[in-house]
From Swiss-Prot:
Keywords on record: Amidation, Neuropeptide, Secreted
One annotated Gene Ontology cellular component of this protein: extracellular region
Protein name: Neuropeptide F
Organism (species): Arthurdendyus triangulatus
GO biological process: neuropeptide signaling pathway
Amino acid sequence: KVVHLRPRSSFSSEDEYQIYLRNVSKYIQLYGRPRF
């Protein structure tokens, strides 16, 4: 599965972006580093 990181500009707030980055980090820990 290929994960595409969304740019900061696609989020309406910095908080949403930070939450997204945390979720990505959890995903990487669970499944290994995805291919971008």
